[in-house]
Regions:
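Flexible, solvent-exposed loop/hinge segments and secondary-structure transition points
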Residues: 2-208
């Protein structure tokens, strides 16, 4: 009986401690949630501004977003509409290069309706440190080579790494990584340009 009482008390004590810890954790979460959400929003806004300059839009870019149907905009996972004076001026979209050296490379691309690439940034990757990670702006300015490049029928041959006959540099000892990014930017940009009518229709709800 004595052992039972001790065990019961010990169990109640553990339960009380667990309940207290849960309550404290919940309280901390509620106190910090808004700040965390605000920080994430600011980070996303800053990233978008790296691929679409502020003077391209006067709408709320963060809230002008769609998740496209893949049968219509294949490879475009998330799409932001830049609107200025009720006219679509640019798009920012998330896409994934599936053939990086170490797997998927997630990208954010900014492009105008005329095919000018305003910027490209890497959102996530698992490439080899010291080789493939030169796709990160904090390590190398290679990713800036896409800025202001134009995708039109006459320039398609240029959209490859130099080893494949194009104009984009590859990395010494790491051709696969830059090749994957160049090819995916090209593929996804062509999908966007080939669906101009659909994009204009989608943009109407944000041009009011």
């Amino acid at each position: 009986m004595g052992i039972f009482k001790v065990t019961s008390r010990f169990g109640l004590l553990l339960g009380f401690i667990a309940l207290t810890c849960t309550a404290v954790s919940a309280g901390i979460y509620m106190l910090t949630k808004d700040k965390i959400d605000e920080a994430m929003t600011e980070q996303q806004k800053a990233l978008l501004l790296q691929v679409i300059p502020q003077d391209y839009f006067n709408n709320n870019l963060l809230e002008s977003v769609e998740t496209p149907e893949q049968d219509k905009l294949k490879g475009i996972q998330k799409l932001y509409f830049a609107i200025k004076n009720n006219v679509p001026t640019a798009y920012a979209y998330e896409t994934t290069a599936p053939d990086g050296y170490s797997g998927n490379i997630r990208l954010l691309v900014g492009i105008t309706p005329k095919g000018e690439v305003l910027g490209v940034r890497v959102i996530e990757h698992h490439e080899t440190p010291g080789l493939g990670d030169k796709i990160e702006l904090r390590i190398s300015d290679w990713i800036l080579s896409f800025t202001n490049q134009v995708i039109v029928p006459e320039s398609l041959k240029d959209w490859a790494v130099k080893k494949d006959g194009g104009k984009f540099d590859q990395f010494s000892g790491a051709t696969i990584t830059p090749r994957a990014i160049v090819n995916q930017v090209k593929r996804s940009a062509l999908v966007m340009l080939e669906n101009e009518a659909l994009l204009n229709e989608m943009a109407k709800k944000y041009a009011q």
